């Protein structure tokens, strides 16, 4: 289930735009994972919640607001985040282009490349937790888990990316949280909507081995 949650968290970045055909590379590994996902069903689910669920609608409005815009800018100013994006770009993954699809949709500042070198949820009650739980229920967890294990053995590019994530300087995220009022307000907003932020953080730390 943790693998499925991780794929949901990466879905926008890996499938927002199509990757150009190349020799076998990291983009092919991502395409293999995305190929397991019921994308049409997930899109229908997202649209249903956006059209009918007030909590999800309020969340979308928040993501389009000034406070989250500040969080977005602060997050992508972190050197560890810029380094990871640069790594993905050099591996042939259009990370900036994918993220800028999200930025354009939400009215956020577009990201520009620099030279600097995602779950167990509460019971379904609608709102954000309901959306996430239904999305996770659509995930072929066993197949995703098996593909993850296979990729770690067979794809040097995928293994290198995972090791890159394991070595990600996550302490910069903690420092950002402690220093940014906007980030703290965003966390409180998510918690007020019933999202167990602390648990999500623990899942990510466990998945990547962050201590």
Swiss-Prot record:
Residues 1-19 form the signal peptide. Coiled coil: none annotated. Keywords: Signal. PANTHER family: GH08205P-RELATED (PTHR21163:SF0), PROTEIN G12 (PTHR21163). This is Protein G12. It comes from Anopheles gambiae (African malaria mosquito). The lineage of its organism: Eukaryota, Metazoa, Ecdysozoa, Arthropoda, Hexapoda.
């Amino acid at each position: 289930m943790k693998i499925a949650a991780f794929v949901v968290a990466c879905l926008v970045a890996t499938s927002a735009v199509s990757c150009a055909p190349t020799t076998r590379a990291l983009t092919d590994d991502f395409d293999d994972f995305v190929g397991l996902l019921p994308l049409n069903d997930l899109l229908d689910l997202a649209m249903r919640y956006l059209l009918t669920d007030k909590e999800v609608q309020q969340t979308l409005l928040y993501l389009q607001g000034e406070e989250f815009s500040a969080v977005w800018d602060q997050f992508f100013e972190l050197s560890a985040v810029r380094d990871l994006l640069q790594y993905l770009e050099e591996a042939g993954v259009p990370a900036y282009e994918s993220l800028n699809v999200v930025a354009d949709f939400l009215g956020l500042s577009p990201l520009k490349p620099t030279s600097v070198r995602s779950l167990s949820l509460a019971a379904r009650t609608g709102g954000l937790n309901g959306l996430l739980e239904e999305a996770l229920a659509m995930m072929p967890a066993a197949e995703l888990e098996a593909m993850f294990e296979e990729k770690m053995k067979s794809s040097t590019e995928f293994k290198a990316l995972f090791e890159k994530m394991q070595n990600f300087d996550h302490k910069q995220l903690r420092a950002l949280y402690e220093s940014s009022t906007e980030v703290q307000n965003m966390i409180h907003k998510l918690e007020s909507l019933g999202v167990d932020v602390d648990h999500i953080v623990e899942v990510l730390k466990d998945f990547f081995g962050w201590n």
